[in-house]
Amino acid sequence: KLAAKPEVRAAFTEAERDVDRAMREQIELCEIEAPTFHEENRARRVAELMRTYGLKDVVIDPIGNVVGRRPGRGNGPVLALGAHMDSVFPAGTDVKVRQEGRIYHAPGIGDNCSGLRALLQILRMYEDNHIETEGDLLFVGTVGEEGNGDIRGSKALFDGSRHIDGFIAIDSTDVGRILKGATGSHRWRICVDGTGGHSYADFGHVPSAIHAICRAGAKIADFKVPEDPKTTFT
């Protein structure tokens, strides 16, 4: 029923015409360095584009997420659409985009500048075609998704300070795949302290912190975990 609405059909048609513009935007964002914990420059540009495309209520929250609210009629659930802004590549990486035919090469252009491109294009299609929703939509660029970032941006989004009924994460380039569900994640920092000593003179009678952590890692590697729900550890 939604797909049959004239304004939605018009949005689909416009999205097809909008490909070149969306690609230019993807390239622009990719060429703004955004390693985990240092997404601020890309975040400022994402916030600027959200405002350009019609959002009045756009903030960069204390942790660095960009959150833009598109009000609905007030009678429905609040849906957040998010794409992480950080890249797995370290600071100083050459992020200049190189084109070969129809293929674009650059660190982070897929993961996750493609997600940011889609997020902003969806916003444009809603605004340009005057699509109204019952509930509010939150357009979110999150920080700290990769590695030691520990998904901190998404976790902060759900810290209870905002009412959110649903969340759609847009990540990478596999547009033909939809995953439904939520994966729990826990991270621990384990510190092993020892008395110290000389590796030769004190061998055998002073405990080695390195040996202790290696033994702990070996035991963890032998853990049996459930297959359903799928459970992993590193």
Regions found by a protein language model. Name each.
Residues 33, 50, 68, 81-84, ...:
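Buried hydrophobic positions in well-ordered alpha/beta secondary-structure cores of metabolic enzymes
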Residues 78-82, 165-169, 187-189:
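Short glycine-aspartate micro-motif
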Residues 180, 202-234:
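Acidic-enriched catalytic cores of C-N bond-cleaving enzymes acting on peptides and small amides
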